[in-house]
A protein has these predicted regions:
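Accessible peptide chain termini
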Residues: 1, 215-216
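Domain-level signal for Mg2+-assisted phosphodiester chemistry and nucleotide/NA-binding surfaces
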Residues: 1-55
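Extended two-metal-dependent nuclease catalytic cores across DNA- and RNA-processing enzymes
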Residues: 16, 39-215
């Protein structure tokens, strides 16, 4: 099954395209932020999982980074080595600037679009991964709010506080939602750098942000 999917990808990009495969480490830095993260997924890997990876290693370059999920490893690699194409159907990868192929279409994501999508996911949460965002806010409502108020950390905090939640709740959701880039990883310590926005963090994206720039 894995080889079938890889053959499809080769056919999409040409037989001479190099394919690098990314897999999640057995440890996950997000569990340090929220121990119950993906708690409902604590089932063992399928029988033969390691054997499949070991077989793929004989034919492809395989990358597994300490304490990172595959999405994070792709994000770090893609931003460290611009010009590559991320292949993933996961909506989380819309945070990473560069080219993305979601198995249906290819499109280019700007740094501003990626940063804006991260903030939207912070508000909407991801029930599959076990963090809820702001109750009652989904992706469409989050985007409508940001287009009205501006894509900023201030807007995020207000949305959380309006529902009786705290700044700490907002930060936990933002850190869980964020897919790492090369700037979010300490290669010497081999660990994630947790996202820490300034109070003035704002993204140059959306109806209220045309003349503003992305700041950390």
């Amino acid at each position: 099954a894995a080889q079938r999917e890889l053959t499809k990808i080769r056919n999409e990009f040409g037989a001479f395209s190099d394919i690098i495969l990314f897999f999640s480490d057995t440890k996950n830095f997000r569990k340090k932020i929220m121990p119950e993260y993906k708690g409902h997924r604590n089932r063992k890997k399928p029988c033969g999982y390691k054997r499949v990876i070991n077989q793929l290693k004989t034919e492809y370059e395989v990358i597994i980074m300490p304490e990172l999920e595959a999405d994070d490893s792709m994000g770090v690699y893609a931003t460290q080595n611009p010009g590559n194409i991320i292949v993933s159907p996961d909506k989380d990868m819309k945070q990473i600037p560069g080219e993305l192929y979601n198995l249906n279409e290819r499109f280019t994501i700007t740094k501003e679009e990626g940063a804006a999508w991260h903030l939207s996911q912070c508000l909407s949460g991801d029930q599959t991964d076990g963090y809820g965002g702001v109750p009652g806010i989904g992706v469409k409502r989050a985007e409508a709010l940001f287009n009205k108020e501006g894509y900023s950390w201030k807007t995020v905090l207000k949305a959380f506080k309006d529902k009786g939640l705290t700044e700490e709740d907002a930060l936990v959701n933002a850190r869980l939602a964020r897919i790492l880039t090369v700037d979010d990883y300490d290669f010497k310590k081999q660990e994630a750098r947790l996202w820490s926005p300034s109070s003035s963090y704002r993204v140059n994206y959306g109806a209220r942000s045309k003349d503003e720039s992305t700041r950390g």
